[in-house]
Structure formats: structure tokens, C-alpha cells
Amino acid sequence: MGDDYTDSIIDELYKVICERRDHPRQDSYVSSLLQKGTDQVLKKVGEESCEVLLAAKNQSPPALIHELADLTFHLLVLMADQKISPSAIKTELKRRFGTSGLTEKASRIIGVADHA
């Protein structure tokens, strides 16, 4: 289902990010970002999300690719911060695969209502 290289690079990036989280380095952007705390990581994810939207709005495929890569990277940093592995995301996507998006969304709404 997945592109082996894409799966590999995502997993490799995640491993490096976790390494920087667990063994901070002074010369590491990731270590620096993670040491600033979750709020700073969330701020970066928000910034990168906005940049993706702007690149898409401007209909610039090269810029959009660049910004999507930045967003993906910062999502991996957030995942490492929260100790959520790429395999957990893959498992959730596989669970949803083949299910109507409307059906899946309705099941989440019902689940939320059940917990209210």
C-alpha cells in the first residue's frame, strides 16, 4: 500500500527526532524546539499549517511541496513530543481505510457524544 521509501524516510526521521528528544544536542534544531516545550512545538505546527494553506491558495506546486515537507517534519516532532509513533498513525489509517469518510466521521461524533 505505501511507498517503501516514503515509509522508510518517515520512520528514519522519527527515529532521529526521538534520539534528539532523548539525548539533546546543543547544535540540534529539534532538541532546541523540544526543550522549549509542547506549546512551542504546537506553535510551529500551526505556523507550518498556515504556510501550507498559503502555498495551496497561491497554486504553487513547488512551494506547496516544500511547505508540506515542513509540516510533515513538524508533525513528526509533535508526535515524538507526545510519544506517538508513525506506526500508530499507520494503524489508525489502515483501520479507517475502506470505510466511508462520512460513516467514519459519524462514528467519531457518536463516540464523543457517548463520553459527554
Residue ranges, per PLM feature:
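Flexible "arm" and connector segments at domain edges
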Residues: 1-68, 72-116
